[in-house]
Design a protein with these regions (language model features):
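Mixed-charge (Asp/Glu-Lys/Arg
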Residues: 1-183
Length: 183
């Protein structure tokens, strides 16, 4: 075991904990880089990246059906993706690149819910590179139409988890003694 000093506090970590802590630091750096790169891309790229993520998460039905709406005059919907294999249920997506450090406010969520109703949609996902204000979160939780909010940190975390926009740099194999072998 080795002692690490972090913010003035001394902690004793075993080697596995050290590896886990290192992976967390790497993921935090990659997440920040992902958000910066997403923000630097064109809106169409961001919308497609969001749909790619939802497909990687298993949405899109058996054929991986997802479609991006036209870039302008899209009626408040940026993409539509099948939730099930038969295409009976669809998820409507709003994908917005907002400045890092900014917040999506309640009126934007209200507008999205209005777009959902206008499309006779039963549910939606609003994904952004920014954060959501307390008012936006409260509104999304209280409105009868299910709306999932995914902010920048959650977006980056999901991209890492599902391998969208990232690649595996190295795989580490940890071993331990197999107690069953020696019985």
């Amino acid at each position: 075991m080795r002692e690490l000093i972090d913010n003035g506090a001394t902690a004793t970590l075993d080697p596995v904990e050290q590896i886990e802590q290192g992976i967390e630091r790497i993921h935090a750096e990659v997440a920040a880089d992902l958000l910066a790169r997403l923000h630097a891309q064109a809106p169409a790229f961001f919308e497609q990246a969001v749909l790619d993520l939802l497909l990687a998460m298993g949405y899109g039905g058996a054929e991986g059906r997802a479609s991006r709406t036209q870039l302008t005059n899209d009626g408040g919907i940026d993409g539509i993706i099948d939730q099930d294999a038969l295409g009976l249920s669809r998820i409507y997506v709003q994908a917005k690149r907002y400045a890092l450090g900014s917040s999506v406010q309640r009126p934007e969520i209200q507008g999205f819910v209005g777009a959902l109703h206008g499309n006779k949609a039963g549910q939606g996902v609003f994904i952004t590179t920014a954060r959501f204000s307390t008012g936006a979160q409260k509104y999304a939780n209280e409105v009868p139409t299910p709306v999932v909010l995914i902010d920048g940190p959650k977006l980056a975390s999901l991209m890492i988890r599902y391998g969208v926009g990232v690649q595996v740099r190295r795989t580490v194999k940890l071993v331990e003694v197999d107690e069953d072998f020696f019985e």
